[in-house]
Amino acid sequence: MAEAQKTVRTLTGRVVSDKMDKTITVLIERRVKHPIYGKYVKRSTKLHAHDETNQCRIGDTVTIRETRPLAKTKSWMLVEVVERAVEV
């Protein structure tokens, strides 16, 4: 039997915390149309992602993908750093 290929979910967001060891917090923002008023509203989600080499810093734009649960709240893994944050 041929098993169905499961597509891997990937998201792009901004790193808002890198204080944990090998873990980053990524803020995912999306725009949703209000069902009654029709205005587009920003909605956001914070996800914990696994960063094996601790390469991400606050403000970086990253791509993450879904993976097996690695901890109680961590089920995402870092794929790549899309854009580095500007150092001040």
Curated annotation (Swiss-Prot):
It comes from Azotobacter vinelandii (strain DJ / ATCC BAA-1303). Signal peptide: none annotated. Part of the 30S ribosomal subunit. Transmembrane segments: none annotated. One of the primary rRNA binding proteins, it binds specifically to the 5'-end of 16S ribosomal RNA. This is Small ribosomal subunit protein uS17. The gene is rpsQ. It comes from the Bacteria. The lineage of its organism: Bacteria, Pseudomonadati, Pseudomonadota, Gammaproteobacteria, Pseudomonadales. One of its GO terms (biological process) is translation. Keywords: Ribonucleoprotein, Ribosomal protein, RNA-binding, rRNA-binding. Belongs to the universal ribosomal protein uS17 family. One of its GO terms (molecular function) is structural constituent of ribosome. GO terms for cellular component: cytosolic small ribosomal subunit.
